[in-house]
Amino acid sequence: MMFEYALVLSSYLFSMGIYGLITSRNMVRALMCLELILNAVNMNLVTFSDLFDSRQLKGDIFSIFVIAIAAAEAAIGPAIVSSIHRNRKSTRINQSNLLKK
């Protein structure tokens, strides 16, 4: 019973993240949507790991690696966005032509 609830919640999180990535024009919002996608993937990893083999912790350990990648992205992403904002005076995705210079 809890398996279905976890899958529905993670699919909602994943679809909200994909929708936000497609429609957002702000880099900060895109980073937040990327975090939603990574959290949905973590929920799926833990849920399927618990469902198929609760004695082995392969899904749990892999989700810890995904959390570490998300933490690095959360630390580096805003620094890159603030650097782009300082140079371009905008955080809009469609206005940052970094390869043009």
Curated annotation (Swiss-Prot):
One GO term (biological process): ATP synthesis coupled electron transport
Major place of residence: plastid
UniProt xrefs under InterPro entries: NADH_UbQ_OxRdtase_chain4L/K, NUOK/Mnh_C1-like
TM region(s), chain numbering: 2-22, 32-52, 61-81
GO cellular component term of the entry, any: chloroplast thylakoid membrane
Catalytic activity line of the entry: a plastoquinone + NADH + (n+1) H(+)(in) = a plastoquinol + NAD(+) + n H(+)(out); a plastoquinone + NADPH + (n+1) H(+)(in) = a plastoquinol + NADP(+) + n H(+)(out)
UniProtKB keywords: Chloroplast, Membrane, NAD, NADP, Plastid, Plastoquinone, Quinone, Thylakoid, Translocase, Transmembrane, Transmembrane helix, Transport
Membrane topology: Multi-pass membrane protein
Any one GO molecular function term: quinone binding
EC number(s) reported in the record: 7.1.1.-
Compartments it resides in: Plastid, Chloroplast thylakoid membrane
Described purpose of this protein according to its UniProt entry: NDH shuttles electrons from NAD(P)H:plastoquinone, via FMN and iron-sulfur (Fe-S) centers, to quinones in the photosynthetic chain and possibly in a chloroplast respiratory chain. The immediate electron acceptor for the enzyme in this species is believed to be plastoquinone. Couples the redox reaction to proton translocation, and thus conserves the redox energy in a proton gradient.
Family: Belongs to the complex I subunit 4L family.
PANTHER family given in the database record: NADH-UBIQUINONE OXIDOREDUCTASE CHAIN 4L (PTHR11434:SF16), NADH-UBIQUINONE OXIDOREDUCTASE SUBUNIT ND4L (PTHR11434)
Subunit organization: NDH is composed of at least 16 different subunits, 5 of which are encoded in the nucleus.
The protein's name: NAD(P)H-quinone oxidoreductase subunit 4L, chloroplastic
Organism (species): Amborella trichopoda
